[in-house]
Amino acid sequence: MSNGGTPRSLPSSGQKSIQEICHPLSAEESARSRSPDVLNPGEKDLSLPNGTPVDTSSPASSSSLLNRLQLDDDLDAETRDLFVTVDDPKKHVSTMETYITYRVCTKTTRTEFDLPEYSVRRRYQDFDWLRIKLEDSQPTHLIPPLPEKFVMKGVVDRFSEEFVETRRKALDKFLKRVADHPVLSFNEHFNAFLSAKDLNKRQGLALLTKMGESVKYVTGGYKLRGRPVEFAAMGEYLDMFTQKLGTIDRIAQRIIKEQTEFLMELREYGPVYSSWSSFEEDLHEPLEGVSGCVSNCSSALEELTEDMSEDFLPVLREYVLYIESMKNVLKKRDQVQAEYETKLEAVVFREDKKTPMPTDVEKCQDRVECFNADLKADWDRWQNNKRQDFRQLLTGMADKNIQYYEKCLAAWESLIPLLQDKQDAKGETN
């Protein structure tokens, strides 16, 4: 996402005011500034962030750009010392329940681990346990979201191959985000999750811990007078971002529904020409060609619809959950600040002015400063991740659409020789 002009820095952290923070998909930002990223191809040669030019002479440039973006990500991996992947989902059936486990593989050079490699199996509730522990032990940090646990029965089969694969990708992304975090990745519970063969002994009262943590920050009895401007801007931006994502999600689902209905019509449409060809000796090949074209177009549309359902929508929903996590951290920060303001006010209005500042007030002030610093750092990290994620998402969407139209174009172009040959043969006969 390009920046519109020179941003006006806020006093304490350099964050933009809400008027200057633009949604990553908004056109308003480009309207304010003629950024090099949004110039027309005729005005400026397209290039990657590293300066490599992008060839726009053919539709294949989108695929090339997608591959180069992935190579840029591979370069970042050279500086990492902790690699985590989630794969190999397996279904387990017992007399009590049916569930899915996933293999979690870890490779690391960190001294906090006893071995350089681990391979353990975890189910969804283990991932949930980890997130609860991270929220409890790291309340000042933004914890990445997990995919939603519950699904509507009768609408989604939670044991279907498509659902399990979508969840696997989300769980893999969750662990990778934690592993890339400079603080969360060193958490003892994360270490246990990656290395312990059995988490049952470590899980303990996770639910009670979460309930206690919730009560601690929600029922503190302190009322915040007002958020600092930078945190107020964060809250307003999150509200706006939620609205934009919700709108895109609803429209995308309507598009998928319409594409699915169109796909069903195409599947009925093509065979009609094939059936017709059996009664037309002279038109047999052209009619069979049309039937094949429609069949190829329907297959291409099916792939496009599946990509939108399995790759595009999950990213939108992940960021909706991410926003909820960020809002929860903001609320916790507000509670800590409200507690500090209340205690400080009590000290200011006390009769004995010569008594030193109470220790609990100083500790509360330290908590506020720590919360602010951690939240600002996580906000910057989240913004960077968001830009990268949406850049890859939109580039991938463009690439898939180009492939779809290329396949349809090739299918219909293949029909032209059949029609021309038929016309030439008819002319020779006459």
UniProtKB/Swiss-Prot annotation:
One of its GO terms (molecular function) is phosphatidylinositol binding. It is found in: Early endosome membrane. Residues 57-66 have a biased composition (Low complexity). PROSITE patterns: PX (PS50195). It is a peripheral membrane protein. The gene is snx30. GO terms for cellular component: early endosome; early endosome membrane; phagophore assembly site. This is Sorting nexin-30. Residues 223-428 form the BAR domain. The keyword Transport applies.
